[in-house]
């Protein structure tokens, strides 16, 4: 069965795009005149004996056929890997019989082969499985055989190059007279040994670049980071640009999506770096504003004001002693009327007082010359010793003045007969 779909079943394979036009799907791309003539010429050729196989059918009859992988390779060469497609429109299980523990299954399948311009051919295939003990394996074998048979029958409708020449009996008889060529040796150096194909990827990417430069498949990305980026392809009026493969568009969309993800990651890193700089700036200002603490060493004195306090204390004690001595001298000073033999304390100093004062001054000088380390080690004990020394000096001075007063009283009694 053959035919050409009108509007591809009412336009079911087309859908409106965001730009207001329609995006061409498979089955709507037209062949150019040059491409049409080249395909038509190739389909008229008949297959050689290298493509045709034979087997014995029921009743001892010899049957010629084309293997499934060969017919698929021929279709790819004629139409291109993305220029044709096949689909199973219907599949029926005719019977499933169990006989002596073995299954017998028959399945029929309707297969349609469609080209990129919308033309298609459809045919029926049949598959049989006999004598298997597993029901599942029997159904699998019958279904696959039915689909393969229907595919070969549908492709055969396109021309001699896809198997239609096998039905010509005269051609097969003449074909048997031709000497069969020896099979070519397999060249393992050209075998595929790795998954990556750099030449194919580079060619696919380069084919997309001119179209993007001309503005035909402009990809519009969504700028919102919360939604995944997607590409919108506007409609194109040029028919030649409509033949761009869907795989190339998908690869370009994937490339743009990866670029967008990299941009979002870079923006996130920049924001995080700015936040870290903002957090580190106040801490740095606080550290600069705070005065640096002096380094603590073992030679640094514990209290710096102790020597100054000690000097002030010594100066105050000295002034108090001098003032006390002056008050005592004024108190016990004798007027000139008392007689010539009276000794005036204010006129000359007492030997005991002079010696005590000199001893106190020497002790103060010695204390001032004492190293600071000793003062820092025992400040409390030193202040206590100075208080004791001052108290003893006052006691000696007071005792000397009392003895001097007694001697003056004795002299007064001698000079005064009454």
Curated annotation (Swiss-Prot):
The keyword Magnesium does not apply. Residues 219-302, 368-418 are annotated as: Disordered. Phosphorylated upon DNA damage by ABL1, and probably by ATM or ATR. Changing residue 153 to A: Moderately defective in both ss and dsDNA-binding. Residues 152-156 bind DNA. Residues 221-280 are annotated as: Mediates interaction with RPA2. The modification Phosphotyrosine is found at residue 104. The modification Phosphoserine is found at residue 199. GO terms for molecular function: DNA binding; identical protein binding; single-stranded DNA binding. The modification Phosphothreonine is found at residues 318, 335. Its main location: nucleus. Residues 380-401 have a biased composition (Polar residues). InterPro entries: DNA_recomb/repair_Rad52 (IPR004585), Rad52_fam (IPR041247), Rad52_Rad59_Rad22 (IPR007232), Rad52_Rad59_Rad22_sf (IPR042525). Pfam families: Rad52_Rad22 (PF04098). Residues 402-418 have a biased composition (Basic and acidic residues). Changing residue 156 to A: Moderately defective in both ss and dsDNA-binding. Disulfide bonds: none annotated. GO terms for biological process: cellular response to oxidative stress; DNA double-strand break processing involved in repair via single-strand annealing; DNA recombinase assembly; DNA recombination; double-strand break repair; double-strand break repair via homologous recombination; double-strand break repair via single-strand annealing; mitotic recombination. One of its GO terms (cellular component) is protein-DNA complex. Keywords: DNA damage, DNA recombination, DNA repair, DNA-binding, Nucleus, Phosphoprotein. The keyword rRNA-binding does not apply. Residues 240-251 have a biased composition (Low complexity). Involved in double-stranded break repair. Plays a central role in genetic recombination and DNA repair by promoting the annealing of complementary single-stranded DNA and by stimulation of the RAD51 recombinase. The full-length protein forms heptameric rings. Interacts with ABL1. Interacts with RPA2; the interaction is direct and associates RAD52 with the RPA complex. Interacts with RAD51AP1. Belongs to the RAD52 family. This is DNA repair protein RAD52 homolog. The gene is RAD52.
